[in-house]
Swiss-Prot record:
<feature type="transmembrane region" description="Helical">
    <location>
        <begin position="524"/>
        <end position="544"/>
    </location>
</feature>
<keyword id="KW-1003">Cell membrane</keyword>
<feature type="topological domain" description="Periplasmic">
    <location>
        <begin position="108"/>
        <end position="117"/>
    </location>
</feature>
<feature type="transmembrane region" description="Helical">
    <location>
        <begin position="464"/>
        <end position="484"/>
    </location>
</feature>
<dbReference type="GO" id="GO:0015031">
    <property type="term" value="P:protein transport"/>
</dbReference>
<feature type="topological domain" description="Cytoplasmic">
    <location>
        <begin position="485"/>
        <end position="523"/>
    </location>
</feature>
<feature type="transmembrane region" description="Helical">
    <location>
        <begin position="218"/>
        <end position="238"/>
    </location>
</feature>
<feature type="transmembrane region" description="Helical">
    <location>
        <begin position="578"/>
        <end position="598"/>
    </location>
</feature>
<dbReference type="InterPro" id="IPR051605">
    <property type="entry name" value="CstA"/>
</dbReference>
<keyword id="KW-0813">Transport</keyword>
<feature type="topological domain" description="Periplasmic">
    <location>
        <begin position="239"/>
        <end position="255"/>
    </location>
</feature>
<keyword id="KW-0571">Peptide transport</keyword>
<dbReference type="Pfam" id="PF02554">
    <property type="entry name" value="CstA"/>
</dbReference>
<dbReference type="GO" id="GO:0009267">
    <property type="term" value="P:cellular response to starvation"/>
</dbReference>
<feature type="transmembrane region" description="Helical">
    <location>
        <begin position="644"/>
        <end position="664"/>
    </location>
</feature>
<feature type="topological domain" description="Cytoplasmic">
    <location>
        <begin position="346"/>
        <end position="372"/>
    </location>
</feature>
<comment type="function">
    <text>Involved in peptide utilization during carbon starvation.</text>
</comment>
Length: 701
């Protein structure tokens, strides 16, 4: 295509995007079609990638395709494997796309579709994709080192140890929240529990099949896996309807918690080829296939958004999560716009598979844009269902139906209707029946709500093929595999971080080839996130209300730390005139997270502040005036949970401020030095036969 043709294409895309955004903005007080949001989003993503991503690659970072990458330099067929860019894009996307882009936008829908949509689009273009791309570049230039090692190398050993401790603590919180979403989705759901449990022996079979029966036949085993996944969903319906089998898969939240802790330990110590790799194949195909199917379904169905652009809860009084639009919307959405967790993948993991530095923009910037698109579709799925159903599913049980309520559904319908979102008990019972569940009341965590929206979209788009219950449990399986893949990989990553920390005390514990050291570190990791998971599951307010804000604050603070590192590297590269690219999102993230952290820790409002909530419930215990919806032990649990969350929030705030001071100190020192001081691996030219190397490595990979 000639230059004028290219200009015409981008002009048309710009006009389409502007028109779609204008239509959304001008239709105030009217219900609009979800298609407008999808069109506007795709146009913005394409324009951002083509222009802003390219600007960062060429001008800010001066990406050099002739420079040898660590994957080529250390090509060992194990950790360092130069990988085809399309294959690597899939691996990177599978690693970064956890629960955040699925759940955060669903929870954010409490305030209406408009605030979440704006932040998802602006945040990913200016912050999230920038972080992923720049961290990938920085790590690639330093032999694929991890985030903590990069901070240590560029800012000094003290800052490095602080960053490593913070990364481990944040990873623990992230894993606890991810696991809690699975628990909330599977509690008292025999169909869902059976289907997810079925994938464990299936993954083990696939691992043995690939290792011993048909080595290297990934496509073949993936087809087998897909067939058995469909069988698992169908047979799950039979199990749920069986009075004999259903009780064997009907578990409480606490029972599922201990099962997940045990699973997490076993999955982290088993060989990667036996469970993790096959589950990756399953989840990657399911993720990409479902995302494409959902996008096509929205195009076919063109559903109307029933959630208003702004709800009454923008004032911070919402039942799903508490706090004003600023700053809490920005920490609630989390991964769909910007995620610190991605920095742990973009450093240390993906750089060791990057065949050419010139592909970093496609993998880093492009991969994050894809995740944001997933988040947009999650937002759409949540906003097309009846708002009354949305609030009945996501509000805490203590709010909808206090302990001892005879008719929970009727009570929930009455409470939600009093908020201005009219809903009847018959409607709630009908939806529960259609999706094959005993109840949909207070199915907090976002995942069940997303599954309901997805089920109706896919059911309608395919002309009624299979019933709604099938598609609901298909969506639950999709979400569970999405999340469990991250729990598996995250537990292993946390184990490596913990072994690095334990190695400071006892060098022998740092050895990853030592079975006792591995078992000890893994046990400590799963007990750490398992503890927070248990606290969230038994929390009378649903867990999400307290743990998700802590997760959001910690995750966004980690993103701020990663962007601080990127800004420091630009100063040390003598490219400080471009440092604004990293400093602007850093400043915004620090403002949001420190404001949110301060309010969650110290706000006197008992609906917002952790300490205020703890003091309120402690006063009830001391006075003996226990509300009917709680027991004394539940109040004691709430007091402890909130005080612990306050302590962690304060710790994360101190860490990010200290690292900000180290960043300023390092940047000022770099300005005084007339020469570049960035500690990059010395330049080596890319071998001429790099394409042949990538092709050969494909088999090893």
């Amino acid at each position: 295509m000639n230059k004028s043709g290219k200009y015409l294409v981008w002009t048309v895309l710009s006009v389409m995007g502007a028109f779609a955004l204008g239509y959304i903005a001008l239709n105030r007080g009217e219900q609009i079609n979800a298609l407008w949001i999808v069109v506007a989003s795709v146009c913005i993503y394409l324009i951002a990638y083509r222009f802003y991503g390219l600007y960062i690659a060429k001008n800010v970072l001066a990406v050099d395709p002739t420079r040898m990458t660590p994957a080529v330099r250390h090509n060992d067929g194990l950790d360092y494997v130069p990988t085809d860019k399309k294959v690597l894009f899939g691996h990177h996307f599978a690693a970064i796309a956890g629960a955040g882009p699925l759940v955060g936008p669903v929870l954010a829908a409490q305030m209406g579709y408009l605030p979440g949509m704006i932040w998802l689009l602006a945040g990913v273009v200016l912050a999230g994709a920038v972080q992923d791309f720049m961290v990938l570049f920085v790590s690639t230039r330093r032999d694929g080192r991890s985030l903590g090692e990069l901070v240590k190398e560029e800012m000094g050993p003290t800052a490095g140890v602080i960053a490593l401790v913070a990364c481990f603590m944040i990873m623990v919180i992230i894993l606890a929240v991810l696991a809690m979403i699975v628990v909330k989705a599977l509690t008292h759901s025999p169909w869902g529990t059976y289907t997810v449990a079925f994938t464990i022996p299936l993954a083990l079979f696939m691992g043995i099949y690939l290792r011993y029966l048909r080595p290297g036949r990934i496509g073949e085993v993936s087809v087998i896996g897909l067939v058995f996944l469909i069988f698992a969903i169908i047979s799950g319906g039979w199990v749920a309807e069986s009075p004999t089998w259903a009780p064997y898969f009907d578990f409480t939240g606490v029972q599922l918690t201990w099962m997940l802790v045990g699973y997490g330990f076993v999955a982290a110590v088993l060989p990667v080829w036996l469970l993790l790799a096959p589950r990756d194949y399953l989840s990657t195909f399911l993720k990409i296939g479902t995302i494409v199917g959902l996008a096509v379904g929205i195009l076919i169905m063109r559903p109307t958004l029933t959630m208003p652009a702004l709800t009454k809860f923008v004032d911070g009084t919402g039942p799903v999560w508490t706090g004003n639009l600023f700053p809490f919307l920005f920490i609630t959405i989390a991964c769909g716009a910007v995620s610190g967790f991605h920095a742990l993948i973009s450093s240390g993991t993906t750089p060791k598979m990057l065949a050419n530095e010139g592909q970093a923009c496609f993998i880093g910037y492009g991969g994050m844009l894809m995740e944001s698109f997933v988040a947009i579709m999650a937002l759409v799925s949540a906003c097309i269902i009846d708002p009354g159903v949305y609030f009945a599913m996501n509000s805490p049980m203590a709010v909808l139906a206090p302990a001892g309520t005879a008719d929970v559904v009727a009570s929930a319908a009455q409470v939600v209707s009093s908020w201005g979102f009219s809903i009847t008990p018959d409607t709630l019972n009908q939806i529960a029946s259609e999706v094959g569940e005993q109840s949909i009341i207070s199915r907090a965590g976002g995942a069940p709500t997303l599954a309901v929206g997805m089920a109706y979209i896919l059911h309608g788009a395919l002309g009624g093929m299979m019933d709604v219950a099938f598609w609901y449990h298909f969506a639950i399986l999709f979400e569970a595999l999405f999340i469990l893949t991250a729990v598996d990989a995250g537990t292993r990553a946390a184990r490596f971080m913990l072994q690095d920390l334990l190695g400071v005390v006892s060098p022998g514990l740092k050895r990853t080839d030592s079975l006792p050291a591995n078992l000890l570190a893994t046990a400590l990791c799963v007990l750490a996130w398992g503890y927070f998971l248990h606290q969230g599951v038994v929390d009378p307010l649903g867990g999400i209300n307290t743990l998700w804000p802590l997760f959001g604050i910690a995750n966004q603070m980690l993103a701020g730390m990663a962007l601080m590192l990127c800004a420091v590297v630009l100063f040390k590269m003598k490219r400080q005139r471009y440092a604004w690219v990293a400093l602007v999102p850093t400043a915004w993230l620090l403002i949001c997270t420190l404001t949110a952290g301060w309010q969650k820790a110290f706000s006197p409002d008992a609906k917002v502040g952790f300490l205020a909530i703890a003091n309120k419930f402690q006063a009830m215990i001391d006075s003996g005036n226990i509300p009917s919806q709680y027991t004394e032990s539940q109040l004691a649990q709430l007091v402890f949970n909130n005080r612990l969350d306050a302590g962690l929030t304060i710790f994360f705030m101190v860490v990010v401020v200290v690292l900000a001071l180290f960043s300023i100190k390092t940047a000022l020192a770099a300005l005084k030095d007339p020469k570049p001081t960035a500690k990059e691996t010395p330049y080596e030219p890319m071998p001429e036969n790099v394409e042949e190397i990538v092709a050969q490595a494909k088999g090893a990979h």
